[in-house]
Amino acid sequence: MAMLAGDGRQVLILPEGYQRFVGRDAQRMNIMAARVVAETVRTTLGPMGMDKMLVDEMGDVVVTNDGVTILEEMDIEHPAAKMVVEVAKTQEDEVGDGTTTAVVLAGELLHKAEDLLQQDIHPTVIARGYRMAVEKAEEILEEIAEEIDPDDEETLKKIAKTAMTGKGVEKARDYLAELVVKAVKQVAEEEDGEIVIDTDHIKLEKKEGGGLEDTELVKGMVIDKERVHPGMPRRVENAKIALLNCPIEVKETETDAEIRITDPEQLQAFIEEEERMLSEMVDKIAETGANVVFCQKGIDDLAQHYLAKKGILAVRRVKKSDMQKLARATGARIVTNIDDLSEEDLGEAEVVEEKKVAGDKMIFVEGCKDPKAVTILIRGGTEHVVDEAERAIEDAIGVVAAALEDGKVVAGGGAPEVEVARQLRDFADGVEGREQLAVEAFADALEIIPRTLAENSGLDPIDVLVQLRAKHEDGQVTAGIDVYDGDVKDMLEEGVVEPLRVKTQALASATEAAEMILRIDDVIAARELSKEEEEEEEEGGSSEF
């Protein structure tokens, strides 16, 4: 790329082949890329949303209508489009649901911004107006939100069901919602008078076979491993559990030492000493009263034999994350040296049992006292069903946790978006300058959610929006679309509820992404290297700066 100096001479700044888009061209290109991403997932929004089939280079197929999964599976290259994908990832990390809403909203905010840019309104003014609008929108959402009691399990089930609607688990939705609420409440903890939930303490284990109704909540852990020795007990009641982060093996020396053996007796003595050391390790474990051992490292074949003789059930190569969950579930402490193991380090469970699930052996740790880690074992007829059920349950866990932590919910069905849009238009009348147009554009953009819900349900979006606006003008704050019969109803009465955090996070993420993309007025893209140049780069042969 060349630029002219003051005296008219050309100054080379970048190598030949670079592409540069400046001003409106850059903004138009970025907005278009972001809107394409939003349009891709828009048809998946709501209970009647369509699914996407994604096939990768290896021929693996993913069928889903989960926004973040679709965007992660797509190989998106455009930098502005990637920013919108980040919106979905942030929403997923923060709340677990509302990813499609956030992306669709970001796309529509940029669409409205493009109209304002064509009216010669500066991007900074639009961004400032959007910021004013999102702050006011969050205030409005706080005002219209309903408080919930943490013990109100019915409302929590409704929240879980709303998150799972349209995600391939319809026939078992009520049952799965009940499991999710129980699981989340089980791992909830109180800190400084507030409910704190780490959803990582709920393990989701998938196994094909059976139906969705066979999914079960285990108040303990399910480990996808089997006993290390067939002579070990298959079932241990009143289990005393040891968690070891060290191998039950004879350590090899770190130095390259050699032992010279000159007669068979020396070799025999060497083998016997190894056996004695392993026997002592097993005796030490047995002396503490442990009858179940979960080991993060390996267990020597001979040690397996000694453990089996002592009637101890042992599992090896357990994942670190599973060990941590086992500790929370059973009350055990993870020990890094067998010599340090004591009775106080042992955890407890009513039963530890090896069971066959869909032809595979798994270890079930059940009947733990007030476990702070639990497992949901997901079943389903095919791999695609199980995968989609996992995504639905993950979303439900996220929203139930958010509702319990915040204690506030809003209606679904597009109700909060229409109400916020209505109040924002009133607020815009008091805004001076061109920012007023941006606030009004923000209000219009919010209505993309009810409009899309209507379109995806085969309804007329204009008719639905007219009805919704009329109801909200009459003060019916929770009026939303019943996508099943096309009527406008009270969403709280219909049981369509979402945590407040889903909406506030979607608004914040979408607005920030839209602002960031609007502020870009120059895109400089390096040219792609040819295969020959790539080979030169790899060989270190390129000397161009």
Curated annotation (Swiss-Prot):
InterPro entries in UniProt: Chaperone_TCP-1, Chaperonin_TCP-1_CS, Cpn60/GroEL/TCP-1, GroEL-like_apical_dom_sf, GROEL-like_equatorial_sf, TCP-1-like_intermed_sf, TCP-1_chaperonin, thermosome_alpha
SUPFAM superfamilies for the chain: GroEL apical domain-like, GroEL equatorial domain-like, GroEL-intermediate domain like
GO molecular function: ATP binding; ATP hydrolysis activity; ATP-dependent protein folding chaperone; unfolded protein binding
Record key words, sorted: ATP-binding, Chaperone, Nucleotide-binding
Subunit (UniProt): Forms an oligomeric complex of eight-membered rings.
Record function comment: Molecular chaperone; binds unfolded polypeptides in vitro, and has a weak ATPase activity.
Similarity comment: family membership: Belongs to the TCP-1 chaperonin family.
Protein name: Thermosome subunit
Origin organism lineage: Archaea, Methanobacteriati, Methanobacteriota, Methanomada group, Methanopyri
Recorded name of the encoding gene: ths
